């Protein structure tokens, strides 16, 4: 009865998490509020629970109140199958934890850590509760030096046959270990970090090879009743796939009691898998930086360049059975990780390629996220298998201006340059003189080419006949700005004058007269420049007179202007008149045309009597062409070339 009352008091003092563990251990429903869970646990005691459940209650109570000193009577084991058993346990049977000659009793140890004597007394619990220490080795972590082994690799075993399982572990620290952890504290940042850490690792229970970190499914860890943060879940690659955590070592230093008298407890809960067993271990490690790992890699030495040359010859050896043979290999001097020039070329011994990557970038990337995968072939490239290539170190030393090289069949190499550069540099250099001579030749050749291009641009042949289309494509190269004439009135500049009849089409308002008082006449005369042009050919169809004519937004065809100039060749007064071409340059240009002579086209009236006016509007020309014009005087309307169909109407 005393034991029942004591167990009832223990159950009444448990929290929700302990009650859920107890009910789950007993195979009862563990969902509900605290009073519901407490009622279920008390009904379990009243119905008569098994000795294993009673021991679970005491274990949970000891974890709930770890500072309470348990008497040997509290650790008494009830009878199993009505077999006689000792009522109490002597202090000699309580397991001891020894660390460097400092014995200390651990009242927090679960029943699973009792001595072999009690294992024989509990035959039905031996296989489930006894922690197995198989010969399991975990892979060495490059960024951590192993200082001590706090808990050896131990199988995750539970006396619960359900899918969701839980087990408890305990360990204690020695004064030396406490001193190492305390002295490595770094409080420079926002968070307190330790260089010497207590590290928790999980792996599969396999002894074939060193095991990688592998978390059990639905893992949950509590250190000294405080939940431990685990790595976040990875996003699933497929729909419906359960997300998994990346398996990494867990740093539990901040949750560990830095004391030599009070042990630390670790409660692990997980979901059991059929055909898979897991193990855990706790280590005391020292964290390293990427700089230390790089120094250790350099301390290993540089691999002999002859090894790489032998590998090149092996790859480029022709296979007699194959019709395709590799005669050369191209290798980049840029790191595939950072796309920068290599500084410390390295690769793994397990890689079959010649391409190297930069050791500094590779180690720094794995410091942030340890994957240790070769960036060239995507195979495993652990730190222990990295080597520095001596051949690439020589290439980087002598080839400073090239980012790609080519290996030949005999093991030699040559830099690969672009077509614009001089391709005279190889593995054996020609010296300074050769470099200077090639540079001078290149400069002379480039200067000669540039001078030839300038000459071609400066020469323009105006005697060659060209079509009007070609002239319209390049008008800027052949057109010149006409000079101002002091004798021509400025108010008529750029406007065709029709003395008797204005154009019926008015696109823009009339331009106002410009005040010429501020213009110096001497400057205008100096601005005029004489024309030195060769005689124009007889065919005036290809000439463009439009740049010299600007009407009130009227556009005239070049063929019409050419025909008009040919028809009035006998009338010199019209050519020299300022009403038709007010610019001096235009007069000089047309003087040469009239002097050279041109073929005159027949007029509609058979005479030049209609040449009194300069030009007519597009409406009058269209009416003249259609022969619908009524009686008009020749002084009012100028009838010019009604048979020419090249007039474009802008109405």
From Swiss-Prot:
Residues 2-200 are annotated as: Required for interaction with MSX1. The keyword Glycosyltransferase does not apply. The modification Phosphothreonine is found at residue 487. Residues 462-473 are annotated as: SUMO1-binding. Its main location: nucleus. One of its GO terms (biological process) is DNA damage response. Sumoylated. The LXXLL motif is a transcriptional coregulator signature. Interacts with NCOA2 and AR. Interacts with NR2C1; the interaction promotes its sumoylation. Interacts with DDX21, CSRP2, AXIN1, JUN, UBE2I, SUMO1, SATB2, PLAG1, TP53 and STAT1 (dimer), following IFNA1-stimulation. Interacts with SP3 (preferentially when SUMO-modified). Interacts with KLF8; the interaction results in SUMO ligation and repression of KLF8 transcriptional activity and of its cell cycle progression into G(1) phase. Interacts with CHUK/IKKA; this interaction induces PIAS1 phosphorylation. Interacts with PTK2/FAK1; the interaction promotes its sumoylation. Interacts with DDX5. (Microbial infection) Interacts with ebolavirus VP35; this interaction mediates the sumoylation of IRF7 and contributes to the viral inhibition of IFN-type I production. This is E3 SUMO-protein ligase PIAS1. It comes from Homo sapiens (Human). The lineage of its organism: Eukaryota, Metazoa, Chordata, Craniata, Vertebrata.
């Amino acid at each position: 009865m005393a034991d029942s009352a004591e167990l009832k008091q223990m159950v009444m003092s448990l929290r929700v998490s302990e009650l859920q563990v107890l009910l789950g251990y007993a195979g009862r429903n563990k969902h509900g509020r605290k009073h519901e869970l407490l009622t279920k646990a008390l009904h379990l005691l009243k119905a008569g629970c098994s000795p294993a459940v009673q021991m679970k209650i005491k274990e949970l109570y000891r974890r709930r109140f770890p500072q309470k000193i348990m008497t040997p009577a509290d650790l008494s084991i009830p009878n199993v199958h009505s077999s006689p058993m000792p009522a109490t346990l002597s202090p000699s049977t309580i397991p001891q934890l020894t660390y460097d000659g400092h014995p200390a009793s651990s009242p927090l140890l679960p029943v699973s850590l009792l001595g072999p004597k009690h294992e024989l007394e509990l035959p039905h619990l031996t296989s489930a509760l006894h922690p197995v220490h198989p010969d399991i080795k975990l892979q060495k972590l490059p960024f951590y030096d192993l200082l001590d082994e706090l808990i050896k690799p131990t199988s995750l075993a539970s006396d619960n046959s359900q899918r969701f399982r839980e087990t408890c572990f305990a360990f204690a620290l020695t004064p030396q270990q406490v001193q190492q952890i305390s002295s490595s504290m770094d409080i420079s940042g926002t968070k307190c970090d330790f260089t010497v850490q207590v590290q928790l690792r999980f792996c599969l229970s396999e002894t074939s090879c060193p095991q990688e970190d592998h978390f059990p499914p639905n893992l949950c860890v509590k250190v000294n009743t405080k939940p431990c943060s685990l790595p976040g879940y990875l996003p699933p690659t497929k729909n419906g796939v359960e997300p998994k955590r990346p398996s990494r070592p867990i740093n539990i230093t901040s949750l560990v009691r830095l004391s030599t008298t009070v042990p630390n407890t670790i409660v692990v809960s997980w979901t059991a898998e059929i055909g898979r067993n897991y193990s855990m271990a706790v280590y005391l490690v020292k964290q390293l930086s990427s700089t230390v790992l790089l120094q250790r890699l350099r301390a290993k030495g540089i691999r002999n360049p002859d090894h790489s040359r032998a590998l090149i010859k092996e790859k480029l050896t022709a296979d007699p059975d194959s019709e395709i043979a590799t005669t050369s290999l191209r290798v980049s001097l840029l790191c595939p990780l950072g796309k920068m020039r290599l500084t410390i070329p390295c690769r793994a011994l397990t890689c079959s390629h010649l391409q190297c990557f930069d050791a500094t970038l590779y180690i720094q990337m794995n410091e942030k996220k340890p994957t240790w995968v070769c960036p060239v072939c995507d195979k495993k490239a652990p730190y222990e298998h990295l080597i520095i290539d001596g051949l690439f170190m020589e290439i980087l030393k002598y080839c400073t201006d090239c980012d790609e090289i080519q290996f030949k069949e005999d093991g030699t190499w040559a830099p690969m340059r672009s077509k614009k550069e001089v391709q005279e540099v190889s593995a054996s250099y020609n010296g300074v003189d050769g470099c200077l001579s090639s540079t001078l030749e290149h400069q002379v050749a480039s200067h000669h080419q540039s001078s030839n291009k300038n000459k071609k641009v400066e020469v323009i042949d105006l005697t060659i006949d060209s079509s009007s289309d070609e002239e319209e494509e390049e008008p800027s190269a052949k057109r010149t700005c006409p000079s101002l004439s002091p004798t021509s009135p400025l108010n008529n500049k750029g406007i065709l004058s029709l003395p008797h009849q204005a154009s019926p089409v008015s696109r823009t308002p009339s331009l106002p007269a410009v005040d010429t008082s501020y213009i110096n006449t001497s400057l205008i005369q100096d601005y005029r420049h004489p024309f030195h042009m060769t005689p124009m050919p007889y065919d005036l169809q290809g000439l463009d007179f439009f740049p010299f004519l600007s009407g009130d937004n009227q556009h005239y065809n070049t063929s019409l202007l050419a025909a008009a100039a040919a028809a009035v060749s006998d009338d010199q007064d019209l050519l020299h008149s300022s009403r038709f071409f007010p610019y001096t340059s235009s007069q000089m240009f047309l003087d040469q045309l009239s002097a050279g002579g041109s073929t005159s086209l027949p007029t509609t009236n058979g005479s030049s009597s209609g040449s009194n006016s300069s030009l007519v509007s597009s409406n009058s020309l269209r009416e003249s062409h259609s022969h619908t014009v009524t009686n008009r005087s020749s002084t009012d309307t100028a009838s010019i070339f009604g048979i020419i169909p090249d007039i474009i109407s802008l109405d």
